[in-house]
A protein has these predicted regions:
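A short alpha-helical cap/connector motif
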Residues: 1-195
């Protein structure tokens, strides 16, 4: 959902750690998250990594000074093989990749499906949820004791008592690993640990 990341300001301010990094997996698609986190990184003197499978955001945001753009085949493979090499902890993680629903104006859905297929990725809700869970499983050992995970496109279904969408498997995984839901609404959920 557009601009969900902006709901995290108060929680981010509680976990600032200049020795840790901020990371988004899924660079912005004209919704402003990459610029927003870049600005937070600048203010709080932290490194910021924006991980994506295409270089669209990197090409659009050449003016950003605090963003380390990472282009890879999949966020889960990068977090499994390359994240450990950084030798860094993550205090802020934003998960908003593998879009399978609503797209910004100007992006052709058929072209996205073809691009996913070219990379051997099935464009489906289930595959999206598996990818986000794999990313979180890989990131969890690198999360600081005081940290925030922001899950976009993950609404809570009141009548069913469940989370749906991209991070529907991530939320319970984080809860059994010491995280607490501190915000749900506007099509997303924010979890913190140690705050």
């Amino acid at each position: 959902m557009a601009h969900f990341h902006t709901n995290s300001s108060e929680y981010i301010n509680q976990v600032i750690d200049t020795n840790a990094i901020m990371m988004e997996i899924g660079s912005d698609r004209n919704e402003g998250s990459t610029s927003w986190f870049d600005n937070f990184a600048k203010i709080h003197k932290q490194e910021f990594y924006s991980v994506d499978v295409i270089d669209d955001a990197e090409n659009r945001h050449t003016h950003l000074e605090n963003t380390n753009f990472i282009i890879c085949d999949a966020g889960s493979s990068w977090t499994a093989t390359e994240l450990p090499k950084l030798n860094k902890k993550i205090n802020i993680l934003y998960l908003d990749n593998y879009d399978w629903g609503n797209y910004p104006v100007g992006i052709n859905e058929k072209n996205i499906i073809k691009e996913y297929a070219r990379r051997g990725v099935d464009w489906s809700t289930f595959e999206c949820q598996k990818e986000h869970l794999a990313q979180m499983v890989n990131c969890l050992p690198y999360m600081t004791d005081k940290s925030v995970v922001i899950c976009d496109d993950t609404p809570f279904i009141d009548h069913a008592g469940i989370y749906f969408g991209k991070c529907s498997a991530v939320v319970p995984y984080l809860c059994i690993n010491g995280y607490e839901v501190v915000f749900k609404g506007q099509n997303g959920v924010i979890l913190t640990r140690g705050v």
